[in-house]
């Protein structure tokens, strides 16, 4: 009887093997081939020669890039810490407003705020020149740090707040019992416990800062960074080898920082989780702590509101700060010339997001349930979609898929990127959307699977269900809220993405963010503001629908999970 059981077990493993194979092939297409092609050209004789010939300029650019990353990491992490601390430990007017204001930059295009910053603080800025009479040069390092910190501070806020909410209140009670003052408790207890989350946030913001392309193009001025150098090498001189070489220089620190961040993320539970009842955290009322925290918090709230009100108001006036006459001209322009870009962007994201969510679920299932020992490799591989700078990934796609893909002398894929590609290049853009959306969904599904008792799935298996049937009929319903979250994130991030697709957009496949960037380059800020307002409105509608759906799914599955 043992032989039939063995055969049956092998038969049951065949679908798992097929799923694993298809998933690995998908990751190879999404990440392996583009990165391999980029590395191949970057380390070629032409690529290395291009780097050597411009070594001095590249060193200066590398230093600029690292300085920018450090500044964004420090400022963004500080904003994340004070806003998270205020949200968790303080009671003050506008507390709910702080949460939503802090999350607002996550649903807008990355360079939308740069346009508003120029309008407010440029040489003829509404605030700098209109109020104070100062001709301020906002272009360069300072402007980039302001905009990028505003854009990515929500990442630090969510990360640090999540750790603070898991603090054990007994630690603060013990500190007070020993006679420590509130400020001393903040410095000697709170900050040391939140260091892992702060370091992880700093590293994430560092990578985002050095990888961003759109803001340096709009606000960089003479301050060159590696991402913009890659763009100018391709768009300006058509020097693909030089661009690939510079991309490798950008890729190395990004992957190194990602590996360190992954290590610290895995360690943070050691400090916060004690295994004892946590209880509610005690409110901090001491003015020695409250005032220093609330001053930057209220400054942050006012700053973000002013920036986004500039976007909104600017879309309804002729020229904000010059001719404030009410007009709908900018929206008529978008409706007349940009409606196709809106529909194309929305349709591509609606295709990419579900595929990314399914792949994220499968990767998480393989990592947690099927291959826990070697799952870290697959987990790391799937996370490369966000670890690799968008500029580097987009260039890799342009290099890899601008021509047919061949294997052993046979064509296995047609041209996917470029104006002559299948679908006008839309397939390559969708693939980039998928690659960039997988990591967040993957982490959400891994967390959800770890919270589900494996005996639930084992019970289905004992009743004769196959592994695939168990995945579809048991596991999927239990993690569907995570799937909805993954789909929502995929849609919102894809709709606001530009850095990773700037090299593969085509006239046949217009994307909203690319259209906005064109309007900014042409100095038509009103049109850009109108695009941004519509884009933010679309994303908000999607988020509200997803929030209602997640709440309903959580209510329907809570009893089953218990």
List the predicted regions and their residue ranges.
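Membrane-interfacial helix termini and adjacent extracytoplasmic/periplasmic loops
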Residues: 3-9, 48-49, 56-59, 94-97, ...
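Transmembrane-helix boundary motif in ABC transporter permease subunits
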Residues: 51, 71-102, 115, 185-190, ...
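Membrane-embedded alpha-helices of multi-pass transport/permease systems
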Residues: 32-40, 78-85, 112-115, 128, ...
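Transmembrane alpha-helices
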Residues: 74, 104, 149-168, 182-211, ...
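Cytoplasmic-entry segments and transmembrane alpha-helices of multi-pass inner-membrane transporters
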Residues: 17, 86-117, 172, 186, ...
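Interhelical loop and adjacent transmembrane-helix boundary motif
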Residues: 9-16, 49, 53-56, 139, ...
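C-terminal transmembrane helix and the adjacent membrane-cytosol boundary/short C-terminal tail
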Residues: 2-8, 14-20, 34, 94-95, ...
């Amino acid at each position: 009887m043992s032989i039939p059981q063995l055969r049956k077990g092998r038969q049951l493993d065949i679908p798992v093997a097929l799923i694993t194979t298809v998933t690995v092939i998908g990751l190879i297409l999404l990440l392996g081939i583009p990165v391999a092609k980029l590395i191949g050209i970057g380390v070629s004789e032409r690529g290395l020669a291009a780097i050597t010939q411009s070594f001095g300029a590249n060193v200066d650019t590398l230093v600029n890039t690292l300085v920018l990353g450090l500044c964004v990491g420090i400022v963004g992490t500080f904003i994340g810490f004070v806003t998270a601390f205020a949200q968790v430990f303080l009671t003050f007017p506008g507390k709910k407003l702080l949460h939503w204001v802090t999350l607002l930059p996550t649903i807008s295009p990355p360079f939308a705020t740069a346009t508003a910053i120029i309008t407010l603080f440029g040489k003829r800025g509404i605030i700098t020149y209109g109020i104070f009479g100062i001709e301020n040069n906002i272009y360069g390092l300072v402007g980039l740090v302001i905009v990028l910190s505003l854009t990515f501070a929500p990442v630090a806020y969510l990360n640090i707040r999540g750790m603070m909410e898991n603090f054990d209140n007994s630690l603060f009670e013990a500190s007070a019992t020993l006679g420590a003052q509130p400020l001393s408790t903040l410095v000697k207890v709170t900050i040391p416990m939140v260091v892992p989350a702060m370091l992880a946030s700093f590293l994430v913001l560092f990578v985002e800062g050095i990888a961003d392309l759109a803001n340096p193009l709009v606000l960089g001025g003479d301050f060159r960074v590696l991402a913009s150098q890659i763009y100018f090498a391709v768009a300006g001189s058509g020097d693909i080898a030089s661009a690939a070489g510079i991309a490798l220089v950008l890729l190395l620190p990004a992957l190194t920082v990602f590996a360190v961040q992954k290590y610290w993320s895995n360690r943070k539970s050691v400090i916060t989780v004690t295994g004892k009842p946590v209880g509610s955290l005690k409110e901090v009322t001491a003015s020695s702590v409250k005032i220093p925290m609330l001053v930057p918090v209220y400054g942050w709230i006012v700053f973000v509101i002013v920036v986004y009100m500039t976007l909104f108001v600017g879309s309804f006036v002729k020229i904000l700060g010059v001719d404030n006459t009410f007009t709908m001209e900018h929206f008529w322009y978008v409706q007349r010339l940009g409606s196709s870009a809106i529909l194309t962007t929305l349709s591509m994201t609606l295709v990419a997001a579900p595929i990314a969510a399914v792949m994220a679920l499968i990767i998480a299932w393989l990592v947690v349930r099927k291959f826990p020992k070697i799952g870290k490799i697959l987990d790391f591989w799937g996370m490369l979609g966000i670890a690799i700078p968008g500029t580097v990934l987009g260039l890799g796609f342009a290099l890899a898929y601008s021509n047919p893909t061949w294997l052993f002398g046979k064509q296995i894929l047609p041209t996917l990127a470029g104006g002559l590609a299948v679908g006008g290049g839309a397939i390559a853009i969708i693939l980039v959307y998928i690659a960039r959306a997988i990591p967040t969904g993957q982490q959400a599904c891994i967390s959800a699977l770890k919270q589900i008792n494996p005996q639930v799935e084992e019970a289905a298996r004992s009743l004769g269900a196959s592994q695939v049937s168990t995945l579809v009929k048991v596991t999927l319903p239990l993690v569907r809220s995570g799937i909805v979250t993954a789909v929502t994130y995929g849609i919102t991030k894809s709709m606001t993405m530009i850095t990773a697709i700037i090299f593969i957009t085509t006239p046949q496949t217009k994307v909203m963010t690319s259209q906005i960037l064109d309007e900014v380059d042409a100095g038509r800020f009103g049109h850009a503001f109108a695009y941004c307002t519509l884009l933010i409105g679309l994303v908000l509608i999607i988020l509200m629908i997803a929030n209602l759906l997640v709440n309903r799914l959580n209510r329907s599955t809570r009893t089953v999970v218990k």
